[in-house]
Amino acid sequence: ILGSLLTGARDAAGAYYRSRPLLISLGLPLADALGSPLGRAGGFSDGRDIGVVCNLPNREGPVVLPMSGDVGSQYTPAAGWAQAITYHRDTLQDPRYAGCIAVAHGGDGSVATNGFWAALTMATTLRLPMLFYIEDNQLGISVPGSMQTPGADIAKNLDAFTNLAI
């Protein structure tokens, strides 16, 4: 669903290892999505995928920014893309950036990382066109939500941020 809503010519997503459905919806060939993590030669990783670590350049629509295996590493590149959208839209007056957005897609365990907090601070302070899409299954890798977030409620802990809609 998320991928179908990224319709801007300069939209981008910073993704993580569970983002395979998002990548497929944005144009990753199904053969690559299934074959690369199985060590299949050819495709975007030539068999060296460690679990959806790729990028998906697209000159005509939304892109997936280069991914890393580090937890939380998707947030700051997405914030940088959002900052670039603002620059191109407002300073350069480039109409291709009107209505565009950067999405950071992550799991609940990644909100405990420096990258998340840095990107959140940038996005709210600079009022960047950015969406944080967090999948919260109350289990960050193997740590229960109650042990990684005070009160075990990520959204409630973000209430104090201005310029942030939850």
Regions found by a protein language model. Give the residues of each.
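Segments that shape or occlude catalytic/ligand-binding pockets
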Residues: I134
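Short, proline-centered helix/strand-breaking motifs
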Residues: P129-M130
